[in-house]
Regions:
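Phosphate-group recognition and catalysis centered on beta-loop-alpha active-site segments
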Residues: 1-198
Length: 198
């Protein structure tokens, strides 16, 4: 299972992340430069400079605005980064990218507020489903089998990103008991070991 560390938006933070982990970054434009920041109007480090230091397993490009996708793809190619997906690409762009260009490095969301039917409608079109855990784990054995049977890779959001560290062990135990296996977990660096232990 791949561990992906949440919101690693600086080179300094990137250097703290073990190489065997992935990272999630927030990408937006500032003029003609792609920068990293979760919030608007605050500036941030240039994505291109950041990628010079990236030597990790995976990257989630969390899109904070539209129209920057092709520039990110170009930078990923420049730095020979093949293992990544886009998160929060707008639906019209997902439609165009998947159906007109055959681009699959995209995650669609599934959660208690986002129906599984939306994810399943992208069977064969995108590689990943991003499973949010705002208040619950929205999976049981049946729903898990539907998603895996459709060929998706699954990335689960750690409940502690919503302030529920106590749920980590509950989720781990539930998944083990029900033979539910995630391809990736997005979590904070301090919680990574909780997901890796047997």
């Amino acid at each position: 299972m791949l561990i992906i560390i949440h919101r690693v938006n600086s080179i300094e933070k990137l250097k703290e992340v073990p190489k065997e982990y992935g990272v999630e970054i927030d990408v937006r434009a500032e003029g003609k430069t792609l920068i990293l920041n979760h919030d608007p109007f605050l500036g941030g480090e240039a994505l291109e400079e950041y990628l010079k230091h990236f030597n990790h397993k995976f990257i989630i490009f969390h899109l904070k605005e539209t129209g920057i996708e092709d520039s990110i793809i170009d930078l990923a190619k420049k730095f020979k980064i093949a293992d990544y997906f886009f998160l929060d690409m707008e639906n019209p762009l997902v439609y165009k990218a998947t159906r007109e260009r055959g681009f699959k490095k995209i995650a669609v969301r599934y959660s208690e507020a986002e129906p599984i039917e939306f994810a399943l409608a992208h069977k064969g079109l995108v590689e990943w489903v991003y499973i949010d855990t705002q208040t619950i784990l929205p999976l049981d054995k049946y729903l898990y089998k539907r998603l895996k049977g459709a060929g998706f890779k699954l990335c689960l959001v750690c409940p502690n990103l919503f302030g529920r560290r106590d749920d980590i062990n509950k989720y781990r135990e539930f998944m083990q008991e029900n033979n539910i296996y995630m391809d990736a977990i997005m979590t904070e660096l301090e919680d990574a070991r909780e997901w890796k232990r047997d």
